[in-house]
Amino acid sequence: MKRSVIENRLQKLFETSPVVVWDDPAGEFADNLADLDLPGATVFVDRDGERFELKALVNGLAATDRLLIYRATPEGAVSPATDTSADWLADVMSYAPIFTADAASTQLADLNALDTPEMRAALKQFAPFFKRASGVKRVHELRASFSTPNELALAVITAALGSDTPATADWTLIAFMACAHEQGSVDAQDKLERAGAWGAFCRMTRDYVGFAGDASKEDELSVHVLMSALHAVAPHGLAERDSGACLARGGDCGALGLESDVPAVLAAEHGAPSPAASEQTARHASEVLRLWLSIAHGAGTVHDALLHAAQTAEHAYGLPAWFGSWPTDALAQIAAFPAVDETLIKRALRALAANERVDENLRTALDQRRTSVWHDRFAATYAALAAALDIEAFGQLSSIDSDARVVWNTYTTSWFRMDAAYRRFRLAFRTARNEVPSLDKDLHRLADHIETRYRCDFLRDSAAAWEHAAEQDLATNGYVADIPRQRDFFITEVEPLLRKTKRTWVIISDALRFEVAAALGEELERTTQGQVHLASMQAGFPSITACGMAALLPHAKLRMTPHVAEPGRNPAGFDVFVDGLPTQGTPARQTVLQTYLDTYHPGMKGVALQSSAFMNMERAERKEAVGAASVVFLYHNRIDAIGDDATTEHDVFDACRDTITELCQLVSQIVREFRASDILITADHGFLYTAQPLGETDKVALTEVQGQIAAYGRRYVVGMRGVSSDAMMPVSLTATSDGELQGLAPREMIRIKKAGGGENYVHGGISLQELCVPVLHFKNFRAGSKGFRDRSYATLSLVSPLTTITNASFELQLLQDDAVGGKVLSATYELGFYLDDGTPATEVRHVAASSAEPDAINRTNWASFHVRAAVMDHVGATCRLVARNVDDPSAEELVLARCTLSISVGTSFSSDW
């Protein structure tokens, strides 16, 4: 420090006290005292034999006198500035300001660190790091003050690694392991050696987590942490019984040179000693792992380092085979190893494929895995399992009333969910097949089972119930009485809106079956300010595009007109007219629409457009295309375009997913640009789809039909009057053809044999999946308007009574307050206990609030917590259980409980680190 700076600082201190003590432990400035320019001040050097004189001088100071006492501390002695217990000048030291100018004192002062021999030794050890001007600043940013060398060491290690994490032992270990994974353990070691911190780091790993190996060797430290934590929770007695066989089937604990760190339960057969880790270091290792898990969600180096360590440990110790012998409830507590997820999934897959009940413990474990760190690695497989469990939960169809309306209403309120679950399963299965190769065989077995459950049980039984109830009406009228009909759509749905809104929007999505529309409604509720009402209507026969599109247009009369058969051409086909006008193609449909408006609403204009063309227009072009139209029909075609093509029919469920996305975008565009308040979304028909090849018993030949055929498809026959078949159901077409035509429909899921491919995706028949057409009414609301309901996230509340925490580990039951659906959105919460000063008292747990169960008892969940060793002895401290919404960081945190820590422990688990 420059002399002028020293003089200036001393003068400022004299302004506050007549006596200033200069503490110079190393005596660096003893030879420079005579050169100081301190007007009016006496400089006295504290030496042995001269303290009586110094004491007298102090006691005789006049009011205007100034005295600088210079004190040097011999090597190894305690500075009087720190310890005044045996100091002749203790009274002076109690009030006189202390001045230091040596480099160590300055650095310690800048760090707000105690000036002790131990701290000076630590500072000397880290001298390479503090040579850089930014060293002190960076370390001080990590911690406000330092009382021990270990605190300083942790901050230096953290800073040297370039980490922004807190400078605590657990965070520092994770920072090193992440750095070692990303840059190599040699580079990570080099960073600490250049900072003079490698020795301190090695001591910390030994003292804190019991690691006696070489941290410079790839993976040793990280695997030690994982295995020490696993050892602490291994089911008692299980490992001693099974470890030898487990390791023989694939374990190689020597591959990492980890014999000394192998948990005793796994090392017994290899003669390796048990780890010397104490209960304290084992607890610390578990805390490190819990912290690692809580911050490893999502991509990133920390996540990748944990994955690499877990997979290395799995291979080295043969863990997948060992986990296979664990009970489910014990496995459910293990979150660090992907092999645990794989084991749980495999158990569920095999139980379902064998038509066995998945026990409650396994269901709970799978449900809790939704927030696990490895969920994304198995996302498609978990999705397939969830859908399969929904299918199994559906059970067998109960006996159904013979009233067709009851069957219809049962389908639109309950049965359609089976179609949705099957669609979700097939979508997930396509991806899951390539997700985890070791699960491929089990997945295919499950897929076979699900196909049987859906096709042979549900579809067959639901079709039988519907046919039994509707057969007479279909044969007599061609439709079921008292169920809304598609041909009345314009009168019942569009006309009322014409009278009260400036413009009515109608979106017709080809083959948008009811269950897909239900999913669309949920997505619209979730992503917009609008609200959705979903109803249904029955399509006409045959349930094909030509008939459905015509029926949705305004009309008084719909007629199916057969083509005149040409020689050698049979069947010849038919056309569909409304009020004498053709309906094939968008221009023809606009003509029908405008003709109706001219007749019944003079002055109104109607527009019909393809949605793809509409969305591809510029904003100004869309405005111009719509103009002053009072009715806009937008035709969307994704599902049918994919399904009707034999080369792409197996992509139809992907098309359903894409349709939901596209229709949401279309609705948002209409609302944003045209301020639409009401939008109707419907379809011309539904569809049937089963993934696996059909057998011969699932088909009927056209030779079973007697009479002249006008047209036919996989699921229908339209013939001239008198056509019949003992293998098919008659469907009257009298009302739509003046008795000229007659319909025939294959029963259940039977397809008509036809040349060419394309038999898995079909429509045209009378099944509920084909006939049940959605009528989705989307109503937009402006914020604050009457009827507006804002979106909100599902919240959590605590079920378990909690006033005092008396155990180091405990479980709490949580309730998801509302079912997810409509405007209630799913959310993931980070839950943790915190002391009043913000210090974490436990690890952070991730809990999902995503249940759509209407019954509150089915929306409960359990979360386990472990009190951190550092706060175990804070008896009487108050803490809060805080829930933070991961999906909405701006949301206010929820305080679910306030309680008191009161843990009685025989052994302290606190650490010098």
Task: Give the predicted meaning of each segment.
Residues D510:
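Ligand-binding pocket scaffold of soluble enzyme catalytic domains
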Residues M1-T504, R513-I679, A683-W913:
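…; additionally, a secondary subgroup of soluble metalloenzymes is captured
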Residues I507:
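Active-site-adjacent beta-strand anchor residues
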